[in-house]
Amino acid sequence: MSHGGGGHAAELFPEDQVLAFGAVLSLVGIYIAHFFPSLAMLLGGLLAAGACVAGANTTRRVAAYGLGTGVPSIGMVSLGMGTISALAGVLIPSAFGLPVLVTPILAAVIAVVVGFIVGKLTQNPVGMKVPIIVSSMTKLSLMGALAILGFCTAFAGGFSADIIINGAINNGVIALAFIAAGMAILHPFNACIGPDESHKRTMTLAVACGFMAWLVFAIAKLDIVSTAVAAIFWFIAYGTFVKTSLADACEVKYVPELPKKE
């Protein structure tokens, strides 16, 4: 049921489990990309998609309270908080002499703090009356940070400050991460929203969007193997989404080719 006209069906997968699954996968992927640069895009990019899926699931839950056009906006907010947190996690260790291996964990901790603060601000002074807005902003900030750091690390081949600055910031790749991961987090529920929305169908599209973000990065890096694997994974996931949509629809009408003349 929708909490506020948002079009939210019953949950098949508990949010906290999806969140934990996405966080663990993305963190593992970040460390794999750092320690094994040759596998950075293949495995790091794949596992970074887990953060996108978990973020899309949280977007679905909070947007069910009737955010309306706020569905895309909250996805962008997620990546805004995530970008700040990821950059802080990358730069603080080099500035204060901390071990570089704490970077992903530090970014995650900062993201949780930033998300909590932003969530509180949306209650007061903004005045949003969504009961789960604070916890949702916290989770979205975390997933945004892990997605940004995950894809940037996969592209650059590591998460130390010098590698990220030269391999993901100076060349503008972090902007690509912002858009690709942001779309993967906001689009699934925005596309499936409505009275006939189902958790399974929305999450299937979320997986497809996560794979598409990975595919975009694989193409940008000119990684042939990762591009081929990501394309196959995306094709399977999106094909499953289309089949699920056709099965759930009460009626399917195929639009003929537009007439060439009146």
Swiss-Prot record:
Topology of the protein relative to the lipid bilayer: Multi-pass membrane protein
UniProt pathway: One-carbon metabolism; methanogenesis from CO(2); methyl-coenzyme M from 5,10-methylene-5,6,7,8-tetrahydromethanopterin: step 2/2
First and last residue of the signal peptide: none
Reactions accelerated catalytically: 5-methyl-5,6,7,8-tetrahydromethanopterin + coenzyme M + 2 Na(+)(in) = 5,6,7,8-tetrahydromethanopterin + methyl-coenzyme M + 2 Na(+)(out)
Enzyme superclass (EC): translocase
Any single GO CC term annotated in Swiss-Prot or TrEMBL for this entry: plasma membrane
Transmembrane spans: 27-47, 72-92, 98-118, 145-165, 173-193, 200-220, 222-242
GO function terms (MF aspect): tetrahydromethanopterin S-methyltransferase activity
Subcellular location: Cell membrane
Function: Part of a complex that catalyzes the formation of methyl-coenzyme M and tetrahydromethanopterin from coenzyme M and methyl-tetrahydromethanopterin. This is an energy-conserving, sodium-ion translocating step.
Record family assignment: Belongs to the MtrC family.
Protein name: Tetrahydromethanopterin S-methyltransferase subunit C
Species lineage: Archaea, Methanobacteriati, Methanobacteriota, Methanomada group, Methanococci
